[in-house]
Amino acid sequence: MEANHQRNDLGLVALTMLAQYHNISLNPEEIKHKFDLDGKGLSLTSWLLAAKSLALKAKHIKKEISRLHLVNLPALVWQDNGKHFLLVKVDTDNNRYLTYNLEQDAPQILSQDEFEACYQGQLILVTSRASVVGQLAKFDFTWFIPAVIKYRKIFLETLIVSIFLQIFALITPLFFQVVMDKVLVHRGFSTLNIITVALAIVIIFEIVLSGLRTYVFSHSTSRIDVELGAKLFRHLLSLPISYFENRRVGDTVARVRELDQIRNFLTGQALTSVLDLLFSFIFFAVMWYYSPKLTLVILGSLPCYILWSIFISPILRRRLDDKFARSADNQAFLVESVTAINMIKAMAVAPQMTDTWDKQLASYVSSSFRVTVLATIGQQGVQLIQKTVMVINLWLGAHLVISGDLSIGQLIAFNMLSGQVIAPVIRLAQLWQDFQQVGISVTRLGDVLNSPTEQYQGKLSLPEIKGYISFKNIRFRYKPDAPTILNNVNLEIRQGEVIGIVGRSGSGKSTLTKLLQRFYIPENGQVLIDGHDLALADPNWLRRQIGVVLQDNVLLNRSIRENIALSDPGMPMERVIYAAKLAGAHDFISELREGYNTIVGEQGAGLSGGQRQRIAIARALVNNPKILIFDEATSALDYESEHIIMQNMQKICQGRTVILIAHRLSTVKNADRIIVMEKGEIVEQGKHHELLQNSNGLYSYLHQLQLN
């Protein structure tokens, strides 16, 4: 009976953790009620059905240990004895396995022997159906197919123009043949004049059509470029906060900049060269008519180009990958250095930073040079094949002319036609580095575009928030193998109540507000506003109705008015001024020469720290949110500015639910209730004077420290 109960607990815990990993919230009691019908725990079948009910795609497989590195992780290792555990990562180099022990609620690293002892060969692979749809519509070269279909009329016109260009290219060698074999032999000046005029007309049409094709093609690809750029930025802003917290800013910027490579590829000569190559069969037919032997030489050279490209491509791709990695490191270091310029100058560490930059730059230049050398070798190999074919054709063609099987005019025409065939091949071979580069760019950009955006079940968009907040049995960690940040937190906040949250650093205060903003979904439990589960809510609907002021706020390089009215640019000036007065910002803004039209500079560099903070507070208040979060919002203010805000606090809090997070207890002492947190748990709560009566409590201890 105990084993069954244990299996029930571990199966449910595993399902909860995997659902959280895929940004899906669940109620364990509801799952137990629906699928644990006999009270003996979730069986394999009921576990799979429960996962399906949560919009998870779960599949039970049997896998040998030697092939575990090929599966998508994390996965559930299913045990017949009920002692299931999560497989998080396989380290093939060191034969180690990162697992999560559900019984001990802690990550474990197992050796090969230890893992073999507990692994029974059964896995449950879990993916969200949203991610499955994302994989089917993932960003790669196939993404451009719908775009091509969308502009199929324009591309069809380009195709028709290309056909005419190939016909004109076919006519020119024929004219030269007539001149060599007929006009020169018979001294036909009238025929020469006619052919010259006709050739001039053909050349004019060819130039016009070629320019028209380039214009239409570039116009179409520019539209695709705009669509891709717009899609990229929208997707980037829709990604969850965890995406940005787990990546360096420079890495993300480097990936976004790969759009330039794709843009250059789309608007360059590569695609028109592909079109020219597709019509080569027309030339082959005419060339075969002239001389099958010479045509076979040309055809025989094509596999040489292909084989040479196949040989060079893998090496080139590896070197391009390395070049991108070095470039991303440089980009990240540059962004980090510029962002931290005040610290660098204050600590006089510019020489150390310069030394690091020089080393990274040298590494990038070396990597770039290796790419250039290999690309040059590739191009010279193509030139070698081309020159060899030219020599063979010259020798064989001369033999055919001498033997009378081919006229001089036909030989010249044949060489011109072969040039039309080989030219796009050579261009493509020379552009092969661009093909490889754009392939890597698509992959790197796919890292952004294929990352799942913030998902929510049911698109729950409700009317205006009233402000009743409930945290029920909240358990949360940022990663499956990370320590628990919040553990069994239960908290009810009444509508219009002012709550102060205090505690040591790392106690989980800010994490609680991140869950309230739905930046994350709890591993266990529910966060509710007005009785509605935020796991099912539209994040944009929620965040529009919550005002947040952090310790370090970012202002955009716009005017003060635009920064305050960021969410509604058409907002009446009266509302902007009222919010600024509440935040204690109106007086210093009025003293500025441009007033509310003053440009604040990048990240508010033109203002002091206290001024930036007051504008951020005004920005949070201007929409009259029903829930207001101050996360160390006044810690960066001078005492005068803080005094102004605290004087206005009664007006600020009126009609709102307010959460004040602070280290300075003076900020929260007038709150309706103070919550004291320690190691992810609520250890005390009450009013200021009530908490001080407990001399052994954490609040009293912190208060005494600040008094001293």
Curated annotation (Swiss-Prot):
Annotated transmembrane regions: 159-179, 192-212, 270-290, 296-316, 389-409
A GO cellular component annotation in the UniProt record: plasma membrane
Domain of life: Bacteria
Entry-linked SMART domains: AAA
UniProt main location, coarse: membrane
Name of the protein in question: Leukotoxin translocation ATP-binding protein LktB
NCBIfam families: type_I_sec_HlyB (TIGR01846)
Catalytic activity entry: ATP + H2O + proteinSide 1 = ADP + phosphate + proteinSide 2
Effect of G655D: In strain: Serotype A2 / PH278
EC number: 7.4.2.5
Localization, UniProt: Cell inner membrane
Broad EC category: translocase
Keyword Cytoplasm set for record: no
